[in-house]
Structures are given as C-alpha cells and as structure tokens.
C-alpha cells in the first residue's frame, strides 16, 4: 500500500481496505519526510516538466478525495482539517516512539519547536487528537502487511510498537487535562523567561 507512517499512526486508512496490501512500502516513512523527499527531488531532478508536476502535488492539500469536489473544483475533503497538521503529528510520533516521552514533555517540546507557527491551544488540541487516534486505531496496525523500516522508529507490530489493540488512551489524556497552561519546559513560564516565581 501507499499509506505512510503518519497515516498509520492516526489510523487514517480503511480497515482491510487501503491499509492492507502485499507490502507496505511507506509504512515507516512519516508524511513530512515524504514531502521533503519529493521537494528535494523536484529541486534537483533537472527536468522542469517533472519538477513542475511534483511541486504541484506538494501544493495540493492532502486528501483521500472521497467526496466530490466543491462547485469551483477545489478539493472538498482536506485531511489536515480533520485530523490536524501532519507536521505536529509527526513531531508527536517521533518523541513517543523514539524516546517514549510523556504527553506533558511532548507538549512543552512542541511549544518550543513550533513557537510562532502554532499557539499553545492548537498544539494541545491536536496532541489530544493524536493520543486518542493513536490508541484507538491500534487494531489497524496490529495486522499490517510487511514493510521496510527506513528510520529510527516505526509502528510495525512485529518490531518497534508492540501495543495491544485494546490499549486505552485515558491515562495519557488525563495527563494532558492536568497540564499547567503556563508551564514551559517543566517550569513556570515567568521562570523560563528569566523572571522570578
């Protein structure tokens, strides 16, 4: 199948449909890496026509295109409007799989990494969505077809992610509900900025 690691982590695939194939060629490649690789090739291939096509693909919103287009011909169903920005989800996924960080630490790291791009409410909203989907969609990953591991982490049930299909996200979501909104890097925001407590 063509699904990537980001889609598999979020369960953004139809069970026994597009998630099932003889071989999952992109199963350990996060969506943002796919985008960077396509952009790199478009910039370096030396073929203008191919480069233009690849750049057009990158400019097209991610969509399963299951709904008819809008009257003006634009895509009606945009994945990131429904599940959130893949750059955030890939960030969360990396720190969960590679380092096993807790939700609060990932939230604080994301606030630092995406400062100016996303506000703290947006980061928290999509982190909650990520945890809900990551746990609730494990049943889809438990029966994935074979595929290569090309990075430092993957969601394969035969290697990196040995998680039961009925695992519950409650503890992780409870931690996110109790976060101190003024906390950055584990200390109050005024202290982190050089101020006093």
Place the predicted regions along the sequence by residue.
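ATP/NTP-dependent adenylation/nucleotidyl-transfer catalytic domains that generate, transfer
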Residues: 1-197
């Amino acid at each position: 199948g063509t699904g990537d690691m980001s889609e598999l982590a979020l369960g953004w695939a139809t069970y026994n449909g597009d998630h099932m194939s003889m071989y999952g060629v992109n199963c350990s490649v996060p969506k943002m890496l796919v985008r960077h690789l396509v952009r790199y090739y478009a910039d370096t291939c030396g073929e203008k026509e191919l480069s233009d096509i690849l750049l057009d693909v990158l400019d097209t919103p991610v969509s399963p295109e299951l709904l008819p287009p809008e009257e003006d011909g634009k895509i009606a169903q945009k994945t990131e409007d429904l599940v959130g920005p893949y750059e955030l989800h890939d960030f969360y996924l990396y720190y969960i799989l590679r380092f096993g960080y807790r939700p609060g630490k990932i939230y604080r790291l994301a606030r630092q990494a995406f400062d100016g791009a996303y506000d703290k409410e947006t980061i928290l909203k999509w982190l909650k969505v990520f945890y809900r989907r990551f746990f609730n969609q494990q049943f889809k990953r438990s029966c994935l077809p074979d595929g290569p591991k090309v990075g430092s982490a993957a969601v394969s049930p035969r290697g990196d992610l040995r998680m039961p299909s009925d695992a519950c996200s409650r503890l992780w979501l409870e931690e996110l509900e109790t976060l101190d909104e003024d906390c950055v890097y584990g200390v109050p925001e005024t202290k982190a900025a050089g101020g006093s407590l």
